UniProtKB/Swiss-Prot annotation:
GO terms for biological process: regulation of translation; translation. Transmembrane segments: none annotated. One of its GO terms (molecular function) is structural constituent of ribosome. Part of the 50S ribosomal subunit. The keyword Chloroplast does not apply. This is Large ribosomal subunit protein uL1. Keywords: Repressor, Ribonucleoprotein, Ribosomal protein, RNA-binding, rRNA-binding, Translation regulation, tRNA-binding. PROSITE patterns: RIBOSOMAL_L1 (PS01199). One of its GO terms (cellular component) is large ribosomal subunit. Belongs to the universal ribosomal protein uL1 family.
Length: 238
């Protein structure tokens, strides 16, 4: 196991691994344990009580974070003609069709989200094996296969993000930056949590939220009480 830095060890000492923190306390602690010289991302990791190998237990969806992620997403759009012009006017970072597909086949993946008009999906299917595992494949369920490219680009640039459980039943979602006010981090978490709870498969049995952890880039994990799904701006009850 790689040796942790002194800064990491000092930050880890602030976290009581034997307790479950209220979301408000976890957000405050995430800010305290973040590296001062940078503005790291604050992320939530969840372990869900689902079996992603079963098609009816796949958890995926979108959430509009009320305070955004602190980062302007890089968005590409697969479109031609008037729709391509609309995407460019909306602020898409790259727009194209076959040329964009060839660029991605060549190894370019410098973007955070991909949108496609319905007529482009047959072509985009050529790179499904590249985009799919990275959570970048356009999908009607997440609003990224749509003729309304203007709205789709604006939504993602404004803080709309996708979430999807992985093969190990883990789910990761960004809720902001360490520089955010604590309340804003918690409000973003609340918005994400609501959507993730809403996406619970009807076939999922037992506890749905098994484990929740807050963490910052290169920071220690902070265990959060998975039972706290309401009144998230309140401290832990003693």
């Amino acid at each position: 196991m790689a040796k942790r830095s002194k800064a990491y060890q000092q930050a880890a000492e602030l976290v009581d691994r034997a307790r479950l923190y209220a979301p408000l306390e976890a957000a405050e602690l995430a800010k305290k344990t973040a590296k001062v010289k940078m503005d790291p991302t604050v992320e939530v990791a969840m372990r869900l009580g689902v079996d992603p190998r079963k098609a009816d237990q796949m958890v995926r969806g979108t959430v509009n974070l009320p305070h955004g992620t602190g980062k302007t997403a890089r968005v590409i759009v697969f479109a031609v003609g008037d729709k391509a012009a609309e995407a460019e006017a909306a602020g898409a970072d790259a727009v194209g069709s076959e040329d964009l597909i060839e660029r991605i086949q060549g190894g370019w993946l410098d973007f955070d989200a991909a949108i496609a008009t319905p007529d482009q999906m047959a072509k985009v299917g050529k790179i499904a094996r590249v985009l799919g595992p990275r959570g970048l494949m356009p999908n009607p369920k997440t609003g990224t296969v749509t003729p309304n490219v203007t709205k789709a680009v604006a939504d993602i640039k404004g803080g709309k993000i996708n979430f999807r459980v992985d093969k190990q039943a883990n789910l990761h979602i960004v809720i902001g930056k360490a520089s955010f006010d604590t309340d804003k981090l918690v409000e973003n978490y609340a918005a994400a949590l609501d959507e993730i709870l809403r996406a619970k498969p009807s076939t999922s049995k037992g506890r749905y939220l098994k484990k929740v952890t807050f963490t910052t880039t290169m920071g220690p994990g902070i265990p959060v009480d998975p039972n706290r799904t309401r009144n998230l701006l309140e401290p832990a009850q003693v």
